[in-house]
C-alpha cells in the first residue's frame, strides 16, 4: 500500500515538471522578435542588364547605287564617338518593312490613288522573303496588313482597303508604327513614309514623343515626300486671277457676219472685239489656308529630312508622279542593300547614363563601295 502511494506521488511530480517546462517554452517562444518582413519588389533597386552588343544597319552599294553582295568586315570602318570599333559580324538578313501611307487630303493636294501605286511599286521591288506590313493614316492610324511575306495578298489589301480621309496626324501614326516592331530583330527594321509630313494638331501623341519612340526602335526611315508636288499645285490655286480655257468669245454675237448671213467677211472674222473668260478667286479664307499649308510643308520638309538622315535612310522630293514612282524603286533598292553589322563597344553600355546618345560614323575601306548608316543611337535602358 505504501509502495502504491509512493508511486502515485512520483507520477504527480513528473506531471508537474512536464507542465512547468511546457509553460516556460511557450513563454520563451512568445518573447521572440518577429522576423523582418521581406522587402516588396517595388522597394528594390532595379538591376540593369545590358547585352554588350550594338547592331548597326549599314547600306552597302556600288557606284551605280546597287546592292553590293560581297561586303566583309575588312571593307568597313566603324567609329563610335570617334573611337574605332572591332566588328564581330556582318550579315545580310531579311528585312521587316512597314509602309506608312498618308491618306489625309483636306485640300485635295495628295492623290490617294498615286499613293497606292507608289506602295505597290515599293512592295513589288523588295526582295522575296521580306516581311511587310501596311498602315494608313489620316486623323488616326489604321493597320491594314500585319506582317506577311505574301506580296499578292498585300496588293489586294491596298486595292480594297485604302480610303481617303481629311487631315493627317503624322505623330500618332509614327508612334503606332513604332509599336509594330516589337519582337523584330534590331537592324532589320524599316519604315517607308509616303506623306507631306504636315501634322494636324490635337493628336494623342506629340511629335516630340513620337520621335522618341521612333529613335528607340532604331529603324531606318525612308521617305517619299509630297511637299514639292503640293507646292507646285498651290502655285496655281493661290492666284487671285485665274486664266480661262483659252477659247475666244465674241463680245456681240448678234453682229457676227456669219450668224447674220453676211458673206463679206471670212467665217473666223468679226466686227466686234473678242475676249477670253477667266475667274477671280474671292474665297479669302481658303487662300489663307493654302498659304498656311505652304508654310507648313516647308517646315515639315526640313523635319522629314532630319528624320531620314538621322536614321540612315533617305528622303525623296519628286516633282512629278513619274519621279515619285521611280523613286519608290530606289527605296526598295536601299532596303535590299542593307547589312546588319555587330560590334562590342569599347566603352561598355552598362557605363552609359540613362538616355545617353552615342555618335556613329562609318567609312568604306574599298574603292567603289559606298556605305550609309544612322548617325548614332540612344543607349537602351534595359532592365
Protein language model regions, located:
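N-terminal secretory signal peptides that target proteins for export/translocation
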Residues: 1-8
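Short amphipathic alpha-helical "recognition" segments used for binding
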Residues: 8-9, 13, 56-57
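Bacterial N-terminal signal peptides
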Residues: 11-22
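Scaffold/interface architecture of coatomer-like assemblies
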Residues: 26-383
Amino acid at each position: 500500500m505504501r509502495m502504491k502511494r509512493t508511486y502515485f506521488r512520483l507520477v504527480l511530480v513528473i506531471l508537474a515538471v512536464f507542465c512547468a517546462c511546457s509553460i516556460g517554452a511557450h513563454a520563451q517562444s512568445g518573447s521572440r522578435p518577429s522576423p523582418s518582413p521581406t522587402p516588396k519588389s517595388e522597394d528594390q533597386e532595379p538591376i540593369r542588364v545590358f547585352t554588350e552588343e550594338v547592331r548597326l544597319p549599314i547600306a552597302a552599294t556600288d557606284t551605280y547605287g546597287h546592292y553590293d553582295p560581297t561586303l566583309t568586315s575588312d571593307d568597313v570602318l566603324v567609329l563610335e564617338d570617334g573611337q574605332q570599333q572591332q566588328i564581330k559580324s556582318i550579315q545580310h538578313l531579311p528585312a521587316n518593312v512597314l509602309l506608312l501611307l498618308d491618306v489625309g487630303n483636306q485640300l485635295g493636294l495628295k492623290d490617294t490613288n498615286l499613293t497606292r501605286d507608289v506602295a505597290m511599286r515599293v512592295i513589288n521591288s523588295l526582295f522575296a522573303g521580306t516581311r511587310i506590313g501596311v498602315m494608313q493614316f489620316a486623323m488616326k492610324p489604321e493597320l491594314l496588313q500585319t506582317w506577311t511575306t505574301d506580296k499578292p495578298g498585300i496588293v489586294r489589301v491596298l486595292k480594297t482597303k485604302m480610303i481617303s480621309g481629311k487631315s493627317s496626324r503624322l505623330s500618332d501614326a509614327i508612334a503606332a508604327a513604332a509599336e509594330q516592331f516589337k519582337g523584330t530583330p534590331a537592324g532589320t527594321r524599316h519604315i517607308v513614309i509616303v506623306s507631306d509630313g504636315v501634322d494636324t494638331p490635337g493628336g494623342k501623341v506629340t511629335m516630340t514623343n513620337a520621335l522618341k519612340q521612333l529613335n528607340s526602335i532604331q529603324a531606318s526611315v525612308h521617305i517619299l515626300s509630297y511637299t514639292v508636288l503640293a507646292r507646285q499645285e498651290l502655285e496655281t490655286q493661290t492666284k487671285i486671277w485665274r486664266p480661262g480655257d483659252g477659247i475666244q468669245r465674241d463680245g456681240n454675237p448678234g453682229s457676227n457676219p456669219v450668224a447674220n448671213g453676211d458673206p463679206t467677211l471670212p467665217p473666223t472674222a468679226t466686227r466686234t472685239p473678242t475676249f477670253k473668260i477667266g475667274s477671280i478667286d474671292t474665297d479669302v479664307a481658303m487662300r489663307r489656308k493654302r498659304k498656311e499649308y505652304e508654310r507648313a510643308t516647308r517646315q515639315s520638309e526640313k523635319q522629314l529630312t532630319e528624320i531620314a538622315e538621322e536614321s540612315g535612310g533617305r528622303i525623296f522630293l519628286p516633282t512629278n508622279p513619274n519621279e515619285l514612282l521611280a523613286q519608290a524603286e530606289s527605296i526598295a533598292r536601299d532596303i535590299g542593300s542593307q547589312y546588319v553589322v555587330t560590334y562590342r563597344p569599347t566603352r561598355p553600355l552598362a557605363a552609359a547614363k540613362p538616355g545617353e546618345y552615342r555618335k556613329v560614323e562609318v567609312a568604306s575601306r574599298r574603292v567603289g563601295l559606298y556605305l550609309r548608316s544612322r548617325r548614332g543611337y540612344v543607349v537602351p535602358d534595359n532592365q
